[in-house]
Amino acid sequence: MTDAPEISPLDQARILSEALPHMQEYDEETIVIKYGGHAMGAEDLAKAFARDIVLLEQTAINPVVVHGGGPQIATMLKRLGIKSEFAAGLRITDAATIEIVEMVLAGSINKQLVGYINEAGGKAVGLCGKDGNMVSATKATRTMVDPDSRIEEVIDLGFVGEPEKVDLTLLNQLIGHELIPVLAPLATSSSGQTFNVNADTFAGAVAGALKAKRLLLLTDVPGVLDKSKKLIPELSVKDARRLIADGTISGGMIPKVETCIYALEQGVQGVVIIDGKTPHAVLLELFTNQGTGTLIHK
C-alpha cells in the first residue's frame, strides 16, 4: 500500500464542514450495514471499516452491522474436504455444512470483527440471529428449469432459511446505549433448527424491522451498473423493477436489489449498494454530498 496523500488543514476543514449537515440528518438514527464480499479478507480494509463504524457511533448514529462470510466458509469447507454446491446463487447446506457455517460465521468472523471494532475504541457485541430468538426463519426453496426436460423443479437447499420474523427485544437493549450490535446471519426455525441465511436478505429483514434510516449493502462492485457497465447513481423502485425485467440487472445483483425493494416496503427510508473495497465507503456515502454507489428509494 502507498501512503495516503497529504490533506491540507483547509481541505480538512472543508471536509468536516461538508459532513456536518449529514451528521445532523442521521443524528440518533439507525443505520444497518451489511459488510461482506472479498473486502472482508483484507485486514487493512476490515480495520478501516471498524474505525468508520466507531466514528458513526461517536457521532450519535446507531450502527447495526450484519456480516457475510461466503469466501471464508468456502475456504474452511475446502480445508476439511467438504465440497461446496450452489443452486440459484445459494449454498446448498447439509447437516455437516451447517456446523461449519455456524462455526465460521458466529465464531471466527463475528468475533474477529467485534475485536476490530473494540480495538478502534467501540463497544461491539457479537450476536447471531439465534440469540434471543432474534430472527426466526423457514426453510428456503428455489425452483430451476431442467435444461433437458424444460420442467420446473424444486431445489432442496438443505438448511438454508428465509427470515420469517424479527424480534427486536434484544437489539433494542443495545441500540442507543453506546453498544454496536454485530450480527452473524444465522436463524432458527420454530422447531429449533439452525438455518444459514443469505447475509443481504438477513440485513434487509433486520433493517425493515428496525425501520432504519438507511440500509447499506457493501459488495464487490461499485453498485448497480447499466448495460454499458456505467454506475447508476440513483434508482426508484419502479426503475429497479424495470431494469430487472429488461435484463440490465442480472445474476447476483437481482437478489440484492430485491432485498433493497423489500426493505423499502418495510419502512427503510433508503438503501444503497456500495463497493466495500473502497476505503471508507460508508463515510463517503453518509457524510459527503456526492455519496457513492447506487441509492434505491421509493
Swiss-Prot record:
Pathway, per record:
Amino-acid biosynthesis; L-arginine biosynthesis; N(2)-acetyl-L-ornithine from L-glutamate: step 2/4
What the entry lists under InterPro entries is as follows:
AceGlu_kinase-like_sf (IPR036393), AcgluKinase_fam (IPR004662), ArgB (IPR037528), Asp/Glu/Uridylate_kinase (IPR001048), NAGK-C (IPR041727)
What is a single cellular component term in the Gene Ontology annotation? Answer: cytoplasm
Task: Please report the organism this UniProt entry assigns to the protein.
Answer: Rhodopseudomonas palustris (strain BisB18)
Q: What is this protein called?
A: Acetylglutamate kinase
Q: What Enzyme Commission number does this protein have?
A: 2.7.2.8
Catalysed conversion reaction: N-acetyl-L-glutamate + ATP = N-acetyl-L-glutamyl 5-phosphate + ADP
SUPFAM superfamilies, alphabetically? Carbamate kinase-like (SSF53633)
Query: Which positions in this protein are listed as binding substrate?
Result: G69, G70, R91, N196
**Annotated function:** Catalyzes the ATP-dependent phosphorylation of N-acetyl-L-glutamate.
- Name the principal localization, coarsely classed: cytoplasm
Question: Enzyme group, top EC level?
Answer: transferase
Q: Where is this site: Transition state stabilizer?
A: K34, K256
Question: Which GO molecular function terms does the record list?
Answer: acetylglutamate kinase activity; ATP binding
Subcellular localization, as worded in the UniProt entry: Cytoplasm
**A single GO BP:** L-arginine biosynthetic process
Sorted UniProt keywords:
Amino-acid biosynthesis, Arginine biosynthesis, ATP-binding, Cytoplasm, Kinase, Nucleotide-binding, Transferase
Question: What is the similarity comment for this entry?
Answer: Belongs to the acetylglutamate kinase family. ArgB subfamily.
Which Pfam family, any one, appears in the UniProt record? AA_kinase
